[in-house]
């Protein structure tokens, strides 16, 4: 029985409502959560309009090394010039009452520094993934936020996206029977001179940037943590783009229930992000699973067939993400993707490199 668009919307809304559920004693205040956006690159270009579109968030400060760009964006979002900071005077943000939280949208190598500095300034932190360069940095970020009594959320936007949530619900409800295996991949053909090929800035190759989506998806789809990881890493034909970081990574993960996940990521080819889950009673697949729009869920189990294209458009993922974190700040709740979630992925990435002998 195919699910109607109305059924899809209803299920998605219920899933999101469960994500945002709060204790009966919590009452959401009217005040919007003010964000300082740290870094004004590509990813910030999605978050800025999303926060403005959300019901409980707003942009109240900007942090950038490019004053002209910052001034232009500030004018778009009614941010006063006194709330534009650079990386040197960032700590003065502690004295800005309009800033409740920061969104860290910087290269990976800067995540730990600005998360810790923001925490010391008394601001809650929404940090882009990957959380950090390594396990040690992730642990320091968590410790700093706990010491300052501020919240830390890692921006795993797929945790708040309706199609991903629907896939999780179908699995949890047993629609596919016992899950046996998962396949997932995500990659793109990267141009030359990208900061992502600089190991000091990126931490490593595609596993840090796009492969982490497959890694994290296998964890939230199964609801389990992998107990065994095996990986291979390669660079094809001595490609000059990949002197410092690897081009390709493939790995398998075995989970306690016996589920085996097979994943691949690359910077050397366009590999549309997807995951496919095989169960004893059926299967499901989400194409474009990790991009900003065009997510397509297909599934077959029993007499049921699903073929649903999510009509939502960018920046809907970022709206849901911002609203969730702001809701948690307003109501003193633990985010669904806290620092500990990011730490686990950093631990598994370390295992991937170790088993690949890198």
Task: Indicate residue ranges for each PLM-predicted region.
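Beta-strand-loop-alpha-helix segment that lines the small-molecule cofactor/substrate pocket
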Residues: 101-108, 112-159, 174
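Hydrophobic residues in well-ordered beta-strands that form the structural core
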Residues: 37, 86, 127, 152-154, ...
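Contiguous beta-strand/loop segments that form the cofactor/metal-binding neighborhood of enzyme cores
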Residues: 216-293, 319-333, 350
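C-terminal active-site/capping subdomain that shapes the small-molecule cofactor and substrate pocket
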Residues: 287-358
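N-terminal Rossmann-like dinucleotide-binding module
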Residues: 11-78
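Predominantly a Rossmann-like dinucleotide-binding segment in NAD(P)-dependent oxidoreductases
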Residues: 39, 151, 158-242
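Conserved SAM-binding strand-loop segment of SAM-dependent methyltransferases
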Residues: 82-88
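C-terminal helix-rich "cap/oligomerization" subdomain common to oxidoreductases
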Residues: 2-3, 7-29, 101-103, 327-358
């Amino acid at each position: 029985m195919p699910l109607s668009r109305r059924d899809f919307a209803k299920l998605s809304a219920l899933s999101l409502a469960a994500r945002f559920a709060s204790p009966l004693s919590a009452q959401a205040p009217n005040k919007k959560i003010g964000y300082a956006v740290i870094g004004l690159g590509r990813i910030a270009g999605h978050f800025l309009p999303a926060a403005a579109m959300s019901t409980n968030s707003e942009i109240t400060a900007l942090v950038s090394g490019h004053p002209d760009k910052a001034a232009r964006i500030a004018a778009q979002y009614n941010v006063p010039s006194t709330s534009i900071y650079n990386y040197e005077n960032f700590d003065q943000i502690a004295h800005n009452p309009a800033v409740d939280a920061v969104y860290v949208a910087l290269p990976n190598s800067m995540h730990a520094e600005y998360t810790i500095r923001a925490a010391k300034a008394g601001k809650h932190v929404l940090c882009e993934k990957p959380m950090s360069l390594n396990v040690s940095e992730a642990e320091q970020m968590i410790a700093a936020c706990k010491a300052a009594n501020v919240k830390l959320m890692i921006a795993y936007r797929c945790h708040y996206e309706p199609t991903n949530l629907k896939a999780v619900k179908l699995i949890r409800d047993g629609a596919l029977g016992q899950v046996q295996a998962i396949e997932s991949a995500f990659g793109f053909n990267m141009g030359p001179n990208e900061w992502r090929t600089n190991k000091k800035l990126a931490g490593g190759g595609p596993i840090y940037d796009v492969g982490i989506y497959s890694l994290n998806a296998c964890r939230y789809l199964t609801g389990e943590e992998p107990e065994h990881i095996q990986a291979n890493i390669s660079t094809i034909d001595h490609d000059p783009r990949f002197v410092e970081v690897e081009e390709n990574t493939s790995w398998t993960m075995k989970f306690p229930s016996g589920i085996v996940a097979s994943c691949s990521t690359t910077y050397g080819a366009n590999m549309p992000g997807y995951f496919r889950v095989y169960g004893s009673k059926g299967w499901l697949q989400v194409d474009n699973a990790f991009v900003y729009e065009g997510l397509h869920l297909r599934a077959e189990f029993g007499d049921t067939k699903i073929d649903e294209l999510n009509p939502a458009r960018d920046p809907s993922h970022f709206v849901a993400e911002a609203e969730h974190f702001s809701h948690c700040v307003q109501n003193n709740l633990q985010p669904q993707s806290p620092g500990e979630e990011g730490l686990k992925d950093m631990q598994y990435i370390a295992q991937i490199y170790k088993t690949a002998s890198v």
